[in-house]
């Protein structure tokens, strides 16, 4: 049983909580891992790697993430979200045109300071551990990229206006911090009210299954399990000859005539089973394929 599960994580549960619950319905020999932590207050797509799928994580964890976020204007939070201590600001009228102007400032590459309530390490401790002790330390800004930032809806009728955003961004982007920083630019303060991850790479919310569905019946796990090659289908596929199998299985390179445009490929057995991921290096008119992950999926 090797592959991926596209879990729709509920609120009030950590990403590790999801892993712990799945471990109860899987044989112990299968490793589990997730692609990208979701905060407890967030819901939505949490891809979980099963068995040999955990060995594919390094190749896909940098994929683009998409979120639907609601932010509240006119207040701030010590955690930058609705679960923290809220401080209300002096009411200030915000014009819709001003919002669009500010959003434009955050599109593209920028540097973002991670929040104190985060799992980032500082001198051997997680930042949230220090924050719970009432400490605040200087954090290094990290480069992020916002590919798309779209205003979906604005509710100006409430005492504290709310904005709904669609955010497509790089790995490591804190949506809480994005909302906080937008509030700072608007001059009114803001915090994240709700968050849903709608996509993580090729994993989409429309195809996600609930954790309860998986736990309810063992056969549901098999139904929901996506193939091992699901998140790497964008890589070129090469079908190996029987004579080439021993070399790949033992981590040795092979040569193929002709050049490849992609630096990385998928290698399959003659029967169509994924065997390895390989680095493709062109030399003259040939390509050398060096396996960097070999899957022993029959174990």
Curated annotation (Swiss-Prot):
InterPro entries: PsdUridine_synth_cat_dom_sf (IPR020103), PsdUridine_synth_N (IPR002501), tRNA_psdUridine_synth_TruB (IPR014780), TruB_C (IPR032819). Pfam families: TruB_C_2 (PF16198), TruB_N (PF01509). One of its GO terms (molecular function) is tRNA pseudouridine(55) synthase activity. Its EC number is 5.4.99.25. Keywords: Isomerase, tRNA processing. CDD domains: PseudoU_synth_EcTruB. GO terms for biological process: mRNA pseudouridine synthesis; tRNA pseudouridine synthesis. It catalyses: uridine(55) in tRNA = pseudouridine(55) in tRNA. The active site is at 39 (nucleophile). Responsible for synthesis of pseudouridine from uracil-55 in the psi GC loop of transfer RNAs. Belongs to the pseudouridine synthase TruB family. Type 1 subfamily. NCBIfam families: TruB (TIGR00431). This is tRNA pseudouridine synthase B. The gene is truB.
């Amino acid at each position: 049983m090797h592959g991926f599960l596209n879990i729709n994580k509920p609120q009030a549960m950590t990403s590790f909580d999801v892993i712990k619950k799945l471990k109860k319905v899987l044989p112990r020999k299968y490793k589990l891992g997730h692609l990208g932590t979701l905060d407890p207050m967030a819901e939505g797509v949490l891809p979980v790697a099963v068995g040999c799928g955990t060995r594919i994580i390094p190749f896909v964890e940098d994929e683009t993430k998409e979120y639907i976020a609601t932010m509240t204007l006119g207040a701030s939070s010590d955690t930058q979200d609705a679960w923290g201590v809220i401080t209300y600001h002096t009411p200030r009228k915000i014009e819709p045109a001003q919002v669009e102007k500010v959003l434009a400032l955050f599109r593209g590459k920028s540097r973002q300071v991670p929040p104190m309530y985060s799992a980032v390490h500082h001198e051997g401790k997680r930042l949230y551990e220090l924050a719970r002790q009432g400490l605040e330390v200087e954090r290094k800004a990290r480069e992020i990229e916002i590919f798309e930032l779209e205003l979906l809806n604005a509710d100006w009728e409430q005492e504290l206006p709310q904005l709904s955003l669609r955010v497509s961004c790089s790995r490591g982007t804190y949506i809480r911090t994005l909302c906080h920083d937008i509030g700072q630019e608007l001059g009114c303060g803001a915090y994240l009210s709700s968050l849903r991850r709608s996509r993580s790479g090729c994993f989409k919310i429309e195809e996600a299954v609930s954790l309860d569905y998986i736990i309810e019946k063992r056969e549901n796990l098999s139904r929901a399990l996506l193939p091992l090659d699901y998140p790497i289908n964008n890589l070129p596929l090469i079908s190996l000859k029987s004579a080439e199998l021993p070399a790949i299985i033992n981590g040795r390179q092979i040569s193929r005539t002709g050049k490849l445009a992609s630096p990385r490929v998928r290698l399959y057995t003659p029967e169509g089973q994924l065997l390895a991921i390989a680095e493709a290096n062109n030399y003259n008119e040939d390509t050398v394929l060096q396996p960097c992950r070999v899957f022993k999926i029959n174990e």
